[in-house]
Amino acid sequence: MSDALKPLIGAAADRALSRAEAEDAFRILFEGEATPSQIGGFLMALRTRGETVAEYAAAASVMRAKCNAVKAPAGAMDIVGTGGDGKGTLNISTATAFVVAGAGVVVAKHGNRNLSSKSGAADALSQMGLNVMVGPEVVERALAEAGIGFMMAPMHHPAIAHVMPTRAELGTRTIFNILGPLTNPAGVKRQLTGAFSRDLIRPMAQTLGALGSEKAWLVHGSDGTDELTITGVSWVAALGPDGSVTDMEIHPEDAGLPVHPFEAIVGGTPAQNAADFKALLAGEASAYRDAVLLNAAAALVVADAASTLQDGVEMAATSIDSGAAARKIEAVAQITQAT
């Protein structure tokens, strides 16, 4: 342990840190050179003052540098949310990832176990027969052979173990609640990313731009969900190739889809969510299907595989109804269970 973090704690409480200062601070955290009290003091100093884009980018860049990286094919994208919205919805981003892969876009999905629902991405995929506790080599094989791979966050970010006990003791949101979607181990340049707060979508989009992303949509639903919602309007901060961020609103009708009540997309246990996931892949009409079609359409636009949301919905529906999305699940399950 050292006292290297101490001056940065005081600085963080008084003013915004430069990116270099913030990188130094997070390097100290991730290398285990700070005490639990120092870690807690630093994280709460940031939270109380309010984190900046430079601080988000610094934390994410250090995490990326220390992760167990995955080599992904060019053009791969991530479809992920921060979690933490407290809404307990069905596994929309997880299902969306396989539908998008079934439409021909490589998806390197980063995720974890449940945070805001009874069933997070890893919980759902485990129920679907995948072994989520695999390392980079298996993920790379899945990406190469199946066109989609799942990266379980703790398997790729071991340095985070230095801060986990303090995070648990603090029991409140910190900068780490948004770092997951910013630290994809495959270094993807395109993202459809949900946030638990509308206030986060623009700074997160700016952060991804600072980290080198080419195109990303950061989204938040008006019902509080961390994805494009099928229940009403969603807000989007769209990062363009030139680094600009454009604010947009998206309604289900923009994609030719109906509006559904929130109750129709509420999830349950991992087993219940997996049953709904399987029904969706089998072609069952539902609010869940429409929510996935909307998010898949957006992802396909971000990937430049579709030019409009309406075109994206058609591609996503074909992915489901042709069985392509279901075959992606089967392929990844076989690859991950063979290890």
Curated annotation (Swiss-Prot):
Task: From the UniProt record, give one GO term of the biological process aspect.
Answer: L-tryptophan biosynthetic process
Binding of Mg(2+) 1 occurs at: 93, 227
Q: Which residues bind anthranilate 1?
A: 81, 112
MF terms (GO), sorted A to Z? anthranilate phosphoribosyltransferase activity; magnesium ion binding
Q: Where does 5-phospho-alpha-D-ribose 1-diphosphate bind?
A: 81, 84-85, 89, 91-94, 109-117, 121
Co-factor note (free text): Binds 2 magnesium ions per monomer.
Q: Which InterPro entries match?
A: Anthranilate_Pribosyl_Tfrase, Glycosyl_Trfase_fam3, Glycosyl_Trfase_fam3_N_dom, Glycosyl_Trfase_fam3_N_dom_sf, Nuc_phospho_transferase
Keywords noted in UniProt: Amino-acid biosynthesis, Aromatic amino acid biosynthesis, Glycosyltransferase, Magnesium, Metal-binding, Transferase, Tryptophan biosynthesis
**Taxonomically, which superkingdom?**
Bacteria
Which Gene3D superfamilies has this protein been placed in? Nucleoside phosphorylase/phosphoribosyltransferase catalytic domain (3.40.1030.10), Transferase, Pyrimidine Nucleoside Phosphorylase, Chain C (1.20.970.10)
Say if the entry is tagged with keyword Heme: no
The kind of enzyme this is, by top-level EC class, is transferase
What's the Enzyme Commission number for this chain?
2.4.2.18
Q: In which pathway does it act?
A: Amino-acid biosynthesis; L-tryptophan biosynthesis; L-tryptophan from chorismate: step 2/5
User: Which HAMAP family is this protein grouped with?
Assistant: TrpD
The UniProt entry's sequence similarity note says: Belongs to the anthranilate phosphoribosyltransferase family.
Describe, as the record does, how this protein assembles with itself and its partners.
Homodimer.
The record ties this protein, via NCBIfam families, to: trpD
Question: Could you identify this protein by its name?
Answer: Anthranilate phosphoribosyltransferase
Organism field = Roseobacter denitrificans (strain ATCC 33942 / OCh 114) (Erythrobacter sp. (strain OCh 114))
The gene is trpD
